[in-house]
């Protein structure tokens, strides 16, 4: 649902050899559905230019895949950098294939303005926002009620599998899951060295910390999202601060 495997289009796989290695690792981890979500920033390119470049990279990769002992279902999407002006674009072309789900990336340095209004406007257009790698936003980790408000307003949230392999961060993210603030897990893989695919390890950590039922629900949600189905969202619990700690 979130990866940078297409060759030569962003800061992910630099060529088809790297793309094939990443796909091989995803396949070994049991992944069969992949949405290619290359970076899109409306301040740097147009939707038309981006989708043309994405299609060319996809065709290059599928040609290289011929004869490989791996079978996947693919969709083309984007990791869309947040802007209040997104609603003025053809955001449907940036959703994951034929689904209504749009992967949104926020700045890591500051909380942008007009998030609630933009999420609302997208939903008015039939778009379902999926917030990428929530663990990378300091303002969310420090103030989880922000994410609670966005989820309560109809958005969904994704975490990176690799984040669960960092003990302190895993502990925090488990709280977010228990609050009902995390819906899907993905790899956000860029290369075999920079953010490699670690889906199986991430799921194992989920099972260890929160049990097989919770882990299975989050994995299943990924498949539901890929097929444009409604997600199995856990009951929302508003985080509260007690003695300086979020509970």
Q: Across the structure, where does each feature detected by a protein language model lie?
A:
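An N-terminally biased module of ancient metal coordination in phosphate/nucleic-acid-related enzymes
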Residues: 1-71
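Active-site beta-loop-alpha junctions enriched in small/polar residues
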Residues: 4-6, 39, 77-81, 107-109, ...
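Non-catalytic positions within long, well-ordered alpha-helices that form the structural scaffold/packing
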Residues: 27, 123, 177-178
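Extended substrate/RNA-proximal surfaces in nucleic-acid metabolism proteins
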Residues: 45-158, 233-247
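Short acidic, glycine/proline-enriched helix-loop-strand junctions
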Residues: 45-54, 62, 68-73, 194-221
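Short acidic/histidine-rich active-site segments
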Residues: 181-197
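Mid-to-C-terminal alpha-helical segments outside catalytic/metal-binding sites
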Residues: 203-247
């Amino acid at each position: 649902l979130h990866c940078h495997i297409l060759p030569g289009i962003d800061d992910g796989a630099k060529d088809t050899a790297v793309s094939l290695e990443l796909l091989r690792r995803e396949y070994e981890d049991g992944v069969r559905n992949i949405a290619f979500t290359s970076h899109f920033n409306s301040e740097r390119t147009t939707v038309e230019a981006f989708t043309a470049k994405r299609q060319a990279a996809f065709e290059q990769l599928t040609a290289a895949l011929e004869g490989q002992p791996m079978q996947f279902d693919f969709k083309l999407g984007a990791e869309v950098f947040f802007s209040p002006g997104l609603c003025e674009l053809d955001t449907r072309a940036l959703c994951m294939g034929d689904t209504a789900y749009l992967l949104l990336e926020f700045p890591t340095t500051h909380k942008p303005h007009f998030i609630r209004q933009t999420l609302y406007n997208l939903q008015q257009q039939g778009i379902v926002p999926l917030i990428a790698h929530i663990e990378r936003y300091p303002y969310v980790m420090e103030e989880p009620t922000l994410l609670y408000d966005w989820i309560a307003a109809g958005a969904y949230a994704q975490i990176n599998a690799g984040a669960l392999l960092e003990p302190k961060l895993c502990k925090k993210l488990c709280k977010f899951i228990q609050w009902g603030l995390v819906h899907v897990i993905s790899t956000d893989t860029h290369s075999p060295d920079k953010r490699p695919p670690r889906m199986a390890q991430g799921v194992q950590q989920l099972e260890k910390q929160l049990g097989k039922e919770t882990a299975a629900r989050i994995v299943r949600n990924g498949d539901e999202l890929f097929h444009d189905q409604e997600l199995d969202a856990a009951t929302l619990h508003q985080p509260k601060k007690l003695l300086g700690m979020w509970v």
